[in-house]
A protein has these predicted regions:
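Glycine-rich phosphate/pyrophosphate-binding loop at beta-loop-alpha junctions
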Residues: 7-122, 178-187
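Active-site-adjacent helical/loop segments in soluble small-molecule enzymes
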Residues: 112-184
């Protein structure tokens, strides 16, 4: 089995996969530059085991060492092992066992990649445990955008970060988080 999660004794292949994810971050950064964005202020990224999130965080932290973007890692609420580890504040890995009922099947992992956790626990600004309705909202908004924007077809796992951003920006109960993250018209 080739997979992107790592544990003691199985780290080489997950590290290669994370390098590939880092290339995706570089390509996204290149597109931002082509569109006139000097540097991103925020990055919202989904996480299951955290490999994609760790690679993206690592890329942007290295690319913009003096002014890295604020990174928000979004997990399925039912499997939020990274969120639980960050909330504990002791740097230790947390595992979510048992059933993880969620529509975000790609994020229902419950156990962090040990390589990515070392990156994420030290560099991520905010971890979010998103309920299913947030991912569903993200899917709907991406599929039916405002006039002039191109529709995007996304599954639940991919739409979770967009739904999270939309909720933070539009819902009064997330005003404190919005202010904490510094999300405004200049973001």
């Amino acid at each position: 089995i080739v997979q992107d999660t790592a544990w003691d004794g199985y780290e080489e292949i997950p590290a290669w996969i994370m390098q590939g994810y880092g290339t995706m971050a570089m390509e996204a950064d290149d597109q931002l530059h082509e569109d006139g964005c000097e540097a991103p202020t925020h990055v919202f990224i989904q996480a299951g085991v955290g490999s994609l999130a760790g690679a993206v965080q690592g890329y942007f932290a290295n690319r913009y060492p003096k002014t890295p973007p604020k990174v928000v890692v979004v997990e399925a609420e039912a499997a939020a092992c990274l969120y639980k580890g960050a909330a504990a504040g002791d740097g230790a890995i947390r595992i979510v066992d048992g059933d993880m009922p969620t529509i975000m099947a790609g994020l229902a992992c419950g156990e962090p990649n040990t390589i990515s956790w070392d990156i994420l626990k030290n560099h991520v600004d905010t971890f979010v445990a998103a309920p299913d309705w947030v991912a569903a909202k993200g899917m709907r908004m991406l599929a039916a955008p405002i006039k002039g924007d191109t529709p995007v077809t996304s599954g639940e796992s991919g739409a979770a970060p967009f739904g999270t951003l939309a909720c933070i920006m539009c819902m009064d109960e997330y005003q404190e988080l919005r202010e904490h993250l510094g999300l405004d018209e200049t973001s």
